[in-house]
Amino acid sequence: MIAPPRKIPGLVPPGLILAGGLSRRMGSNKAMVTLGDAPLLSHVIRRVTPQVSDVTINAAITDKGSWAEGFGLPLLPDTLNGHAGPLAGVLAGMRHFRDRETAGSHFLTAPADSPFFPNDLVVRLCEHLSDDAIVIAASSGQLHPVFALWPVALADDLEDWLKNDANRRIRAFLARHVTIGVAFPPLETARGSLDPFFNINTPDELALARSQLETMET
């Protein structure tokens, strides 16, 4: 569904990095794999920090602490038990940012495994803010729901939705709400075009990201 854009001048939303995945295909915590000179998550933090008012990491916290403590940012665990996928992180963000005194209507999510997303991601998405619409990044005709501005007003609805264990697919939840897709062009590199929302799930994809990063740094 498409809603008319409503630009809100001066809005800088908070950001939530989704880092609660199980990394099954990588075989280890992919947020901590080395890309260039730093962990993958560090690249995401560097890229998102200038675009948002502040950054929080959605990651598990146990009685022994959290693997993400070393990044020096606030940590926000899922509010649901088990592993309910990215929507559980989105719900935690909705609750967290809705309850803050300085909270606006929306907050940004970005995944911990996508290091090359656009430097103007938030500016472009904010140009299309519209009440309770979910504003989603897109490329090559595909939506990327983990890169989105989420309305905090949907918290109760999302929590009710996730009470059914069958409701884990993010696109099924999106189908129930107004969404706005914002298209971004490919990233041009010395090795050719790259989807700016390319994400790293496997060792082969990590090798590709390392190769791409080398061309960007030379």
Curated annotation (Swiss-Prot):
Database matches in SUPFAM superfamilies: Nucleotide-diphospho-sugar transferases (SSF53448)
Disulfide bridge partners, by residue number: none
Residues that bind Mg(2+): D113
GO MF, any single term: molybdenum cofactor guanylyltransferase activity
InterPro entries, per the entry: MobA-like_NTP_Trfase, Molybde_CF_guanTrfase, Nucleotide-diphossugar_trans
Sites where the protein binds GTP: L18, A19, G20, K30, N58, D78, D113
UniProt-annotated location(s): Cytoplasm
One GO term describing the cellular component: cytoplasm
Alphabetical UniProt keywords: Cytoplasm, GTP-binding, Magnesium, Metal-binding, Molybdenum cofactor biosynthesis, Nucleotide-binding, Transferase
Reaction catalysed by this enzyme: Mo-molybdopterin + GTP + H(+) = Mo-molybdopterin guanine dinucleotide + diphosphate
Example GO biological process: bis(molybdopterin guanine dinucleotide)molybdenum biosynthetic process
Function per UniProt: Transfers a GMP moiety from GTP to Mo-molybdopterin (Mo-MPT) cofactor (Moco or molybdenum cofactor) to form Mo-molybdopterin guanine dinucleotide (Mo-MGD) cofactor.
Record remark: domains: The N-terminal domain determines nucleotide recognition and specific binding, while the C-terminal domain determines the specific binding to the target protein.
Subunit field text: Monomer.
Family: Belongs to the MobA family.
Annotated protein name in UniProt: Molybdenum cofactor guanylyltransferase
Organism: Agrobacterium fabrum (strain C58 / ATCC 33970)
The organism's taxonomic lineage, starting at the top: Bacteria, Pseudomonadati, Pseudomonadota, Alphaproteobacteria, Hyphomicrobiales
Gene name in the database record: mobA
